[in-house]
Curated annotation (Swiss-Prot), chain B:
SUPFAM superfamilies: Cell division protein MinE topological specificity domain. GO terms for biological process: cell division; regulation of division septum assembly. Belongs to the MinE family. Keywords: Cell cycle, Cell division. This is Cell division topological specificity factor. The gene is minE. HAMAP family: MinE. The keyword Cell cycle applies. Prevents the cell division inhibition by proteins MinC and MinD at internal division sites while permitting inhibition at polar sites. This ensures cell division at the proper site by restricting the formation of a division septum at the midpoint of the long axis of the cell. It holds the Pfam family MinE.
């Protein structure tokens, strides 16, 4: 049974596209068939982060409007054959996405793949609501920063009211992914801690992705961090998050480089 | 001063300030939903103006309504500027 997962946040720039690419590649490397779908019409970037920008011929809107078949628009990743991307349109108006058209495409994707991961646009408008509407699960990407936490709270409210699951009286399975986390600053009380954010948002923790140079280096070369630097700290956090999404029970910890004093200092057992 | 205050002042940690601010804000946003917040103020403003207008002629702009929320209690501040000649006539 295919799972539809939306990666969302409300606020822009917190790491939705990075996380979509990294989680998608991590799940695909475990042998599952994964498609990542860019819902950010007019500002598509998932293709660029995944290194597929020169291979885009047709996009989500072409498929929604019936101008292209789904198989024509899907781009298979060259490094990982179980990973595909469905790009957004860069030129078309986002009003071209109709609810019925999106529903049809989502049904078709559910048949082909084990995971359909929807990269939501920022904001709480139509585009973001279309991206979350069909979701069974949601990853809420949050930075340890007041504006991001506030917007995540808002998005959690929308997931509980404006999705197909909510309309049927069911719940979208929500998970918090804390990104750009700096354990040293959190320890100095200069940054909201994992516990602070969890207490405020009260949804289960999927993973903690530390602030890292490897994330930018990977997007520079057009590869998800879980493909470009699989042993790096952020990649390890994403691999573990992917295993949790698949149902494994793993303890969440802040990934740290070496075992030693700092490891002991920042180790979490929640 | 800043050197000494850095050493001696016991400032509140910024992360706990952030957490407190968020908790207060979200407690109200979750309850209020979309536009409940500004609606309440607008409604209060309208009704308070009606009551005052029954007794004295007060300019709309001379009534200030503010809300200040704390974790323990919230304060509703109503500031009405009464015309000069009226304050003399009180009790008549």
């Amino acid at each position: 049974m295919a799972k539809v997962l939306v990666v969302t946040s409300g606020k822009g720039g917190v790491g939705k596209t990075t996380s979509t690419a990294a989680l998608g590649a991590a799940l695909a490397q475990s042998g599952q068939n994964v498609v990542v779908v860019d819902f950010d019409v007019g500002l598509r970037n998932l293709d660029l982060v995944m290194g597929a920008e020169r291979r885009v011929v047709f996009d989500l809107i072409n498929v929604v409007q019936g101008d292209a078949r789904l198989s024509q628009a899907l781009i298979r990743d060259k490094r990982c054959e179980t990973l595909s991307i469905l790009p957004a349109s860069q030129t078309r108006d986002k009003d071209a996405l109709t609810s019925e058209g999106v529903a049809r495409v989502m049904d078709e994707l559910r048949e082909k793949f084990d995971w359909v991961i929807c990269d939501s646009p920022a904001g709480i408008e139509r585009g973001a609501q279309l991206a979350m509407y069909h979701a069974d699960m949601a990853v809420i990407v949050t930075n340890p920063e007041v504006s991001s936490v506030r917007d995540s709270d808002r998005i959690i409210g929308l997931l509980d009211s404006k999705t197909q699951k909510a309309e049927r009286g069911e719940k979208v399975d929500k998970h918090l992914l804390l990104t750009r986390y700096d354990p040293a600053r959190a320890a100095r009380k200069e940054m909201l801690s994992v516990e602070d954010v969890l207490e405020i948002l009260s949804i289960p923790l999927l993973g903690i992705v530390p602030e890292s140079e490897d994330v930018l280096k990977s997007s520079n070369v057009g590869a998800p961090v879980t493909l470009a630097a699989p042993t790096s700290l952020p990649a390890r956090a994403y691999f573990e998050a992917a295993r949790r999404l698949s149902g494994e029970k793993l303890e969440v910890s802040v990934p740290v480089e070496k075992r030693g004093f700092f490891d002991w200092l920042f180790k979490r057992d929640a | 001063m800043s050197f000494l205050s850095n050493i001696f002042a016991r400032r509140q940690q910024s992360s706990s300030v952030a957490k407190d601010r968020l908790q207060i804000l979200l407690a109200h946003e979750r309850g209020a939903g979309e536009a409940g917040e500004s609606d309440l103020i607008r409604q209060l403003h309208k009704e308070i103006m009606e009551v005052i207008a029954r007794h004295v002629a007060v300019d709309q702009d001379k009534v200030q309504i503010k809300v200040d929320r704390g974790s323990g209690c919230s304060m509703l501040e109503i500031d009405v500027e009464v015309p000069q000649e009226l304050s003399g006539k009180r009790g008549s």
